[in-house]
């Protein structure tokens, strides 16, 4: 039985709607990832030409590379005083620590929240607070396991100090790891950033440290999963103790 015009229009509308829904669920790739994804794709074509099973392995690696450099949109809470996660990953450490000398934040302990990013996490980094970037300092170093405490002093790293309007200075350090060999920063000294704004990325596994003024109320715990630009790490304005429990 022939399909009438109205039915065809209805089918076409459903297909367009479905396509929009699929596009909305697929994160775009960050431009910094194009050379890597393209390289993996080219290698995959060559592997298929050599031996098809190798080509399928290359296909999986290309998909993984595209996922690694995904650049999803995030919904960031913007209330004054909130500190959001700068990275997707897992909170590996929360402790009072004297900040590295390059931050120039003094010799008294600050609250350090460390987030470890595996090779399966999105590696686009976002500003934890709104403010003005006072300085950016790069330090070459080793590539030991980023989960180790000494990685913050020994590993290659890039440090940012952000001056907030009402809550003092906040330090953010991108730390390279065993696999990560390239830290990328998109911002510069004197630039103003918003909470959750993209400021850099680290290629292939790493860690981010956030240094907050002593006494800042931390709202997360070690082992907790974070989403960059969305998970609230701390609240400068809160003074009534913990707001979560483990279960």
Swiss-Prot record:
Is synthesized initially as an inactive proenzyme. Formation of the active enzyme involves a self-maturation process in which the active site pyruvoyl group is generated from an internal serine residue via an autocatalytic post-translational modification. Two non-identical subunits are generated from the proenzyme in this reaction, and the pyruvate is formed at the N-terminus of the alpha chain, which is derived from the carboxyl end of the proenzyme. Keywords: Cell membrane, Decarboxylase, Lipid biosynthesis, Lipid metabolism, Lyase, Membrane, Phospholipid biosynthesis, Phospholipid metabolism, Pyruvate, Zymogen. One of its GO terms (cellular component) is plasma membrane. It is an enzyme of class 4 (lyase). GO terms for biological process: phosphatidylethanolamine biosynthetic process. Binds 1 pyruvoyl group covalently per subunit. Heterodimer of a large membrane-associated beta subunit and a small pyruvoyl-containing alpha subunit. Belongs to the phosphatidylserine decarboxylase family. PSD-A subfamily. HAMAP family: PS_decarb_PSD_A. This is Phosphatidylserine decarboxylase proenzyme. The lineage of its organism: Bacteria, Pseudomonadati, Pseudomonadota, Alphaproteobacteria, Hyphomicrobiales.
């Amino acid at each position: 039985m022939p399909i009438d015009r109205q039915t065809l229009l209805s089918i076409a509308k459903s297909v367009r709607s479905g396509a929009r829904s699929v596009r909305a669920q697929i994160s775009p790739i960050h431009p910094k990832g194009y050379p890597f994804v393209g390289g993996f794709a080219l290698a995959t074509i060559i592997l298929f030409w050599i031996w098809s099973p190798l080509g399928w392995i290359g296909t999986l690696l290309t998909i993984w590379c595209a996922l690694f450099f995904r650049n999803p949109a995030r919904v960031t809470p913007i209330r004054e005083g909130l500190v959001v996660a700068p990275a997707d990953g897992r909170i590996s450490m929360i402790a009072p620590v004297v900040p590295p000398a390059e931050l120039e934040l003094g010799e008294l302990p600050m609250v350090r929240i460390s987030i470890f990013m595996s090779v399966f996490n999105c590696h686009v980094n976002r500003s934890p607070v709104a403010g003005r970037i006072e300085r950016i300092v790069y330090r070459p170093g080793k590539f030991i396991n980023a989960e180790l405490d000494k990685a913050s002093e020994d590993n290659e790293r890039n440090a940012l100090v952000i001056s907030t309007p009402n809550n003092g200075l906040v330090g953010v350090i991108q730390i390279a790891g065993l696999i990560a060999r390239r830290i990328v920063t998109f911002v510069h000294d004197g630039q103003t950033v918003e909470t959750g704004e993209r400021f850099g990325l680290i290629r292939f596994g790493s860690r981010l440290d956030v240094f907050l003024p002593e006494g800042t109320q931390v709202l997360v715990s070690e082992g907790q999963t974070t989403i960059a630009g969305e998970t609230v790490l701390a609240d400068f304005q809160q003074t009534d103790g913990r707001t979560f429990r483990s279960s």
